[in-house]
Amino acid sequence: MATESLAEVPVPGCNCFWYLGVVAAVWWGLRAAWCLLDGARVWVLGSGAQVGPRIGKWAVVTGATDGIGKAYAEELAKRGMNIVLISRSPEKLEEVAKQIKEKFKVETKIIAADFGKPTEIYGRIESGLRDLEIGVLVNNVGVSYEHPEYFLEIPDLENTLDKMININITSVCQMTRLVLPGMLGRGRGVILNISSASGMYPVPLLTVYSATKAFVDFFSRGLQAEYRSKGVTVQSVLPFYVATKLAKIRKPTWDKPSPETYVQSALNTVGLQTQTNGYLPHAIMGWISTSLVPVSTAISLGMKMNKGLRARFLKRAKQK
């Protein structure tokens, strides 16, 4: 009898590994195809048609005098909605309201409110919004660190914690409490809660800010599950860097768009995504950072980056 070749000797379990490989390849192929189809649905076919005066004559925007908030106010006015602008500075509110009224020929209303002082404002805001048919609420107002910092070394820590929680968390809950009943009564409405990519995973040295934005994301997705069957859409918007004063970025780039470019893109995702990065390059970054990069690696990279930013800030401060 001829001696069997080693290649002909069966290896236990080799067929199992082959089948597992086929299953894995098919699974990854289907997942990639689904991502491409879903991406085309959102980024190519999305039109944002759900957002406009047909769901309510008025839109309410917090943090409305600069950056993303101002861009939302302008884009919603461009779509024919009257705008309630809520922010801290009466002078800036008057200026932005005048610009919007003259440019888009819509009605405007202003409410000056410091969201860092919650006991003083919500009764006044409720009175200011009474009897308005509010179709859209944009919870945009927010505050971050002056620079990346270790938790216990944050300047004026006790007051900073109160301020950040009141502005980034309490405002979202309270404004939703004021506006949602009217939307439910009419069976339609859109609430856009501006979170941050910093809320997608912990960001060291911006820990409190990151945690507040994670709250906004979870709050939004939970509310969407509760109220979507009643005609109200709640969306969590998680931008990466946008060229705003808050981000301290002056010049827009392809991955750091102007607020206007970002908002036009983000509004096109309403009704298509409950949780959105709002802008195609940001969506790609979000997919990479959550699907391909382990959370532990993302945290380590965030720590390294923010330690560098902190060192540069402190060096400049020392030179002044």
From Swiss-Prot:
EC numbers for this chain: 1.1.1.330, 1.1.1.62
Binding site for NADP(+): 56-85
Pfam (any one): adh_short
Gene Ontology terms: cellular component: endoplasmic reticulum membrane
Gene Ontology MF annotations: estradiol 17-beta-dehydrogenase [NAD(P)+] activity; very-long-chain 3-oxoacyl-CoA reductase activity
Transmembrane segments: 17-37, 189-209, 283-303
Reaction catalysis annotation: a very-long-chain (3R)-3-hydroxyacyl-CoA + NADP(+) = a very-long-chain 3-oxoacyl-CoA + NADPH + H(+); 17beta-estradiol + NAD(+) = estrone + NADH + H(+); 17beta-estradiol + NADP(+) = estrone + NADPH + H(+); 3-oxooctadecanoyl-CoA + NADPH + H(+) = (3R)-hydroxyoctadecanoyl-CoA + NADP(+)
Protein family according to the UniProt entry: Belongs to the short-chain dehydrogenases/reductases (SDR) family. 17-beta-HSD 3 subfamily.
Protein name per UniProt: Very-long-chain 3-oxoacyl-CoA reductase
Source species of the chain: Xenopus tropicalis (Western clawed frog)
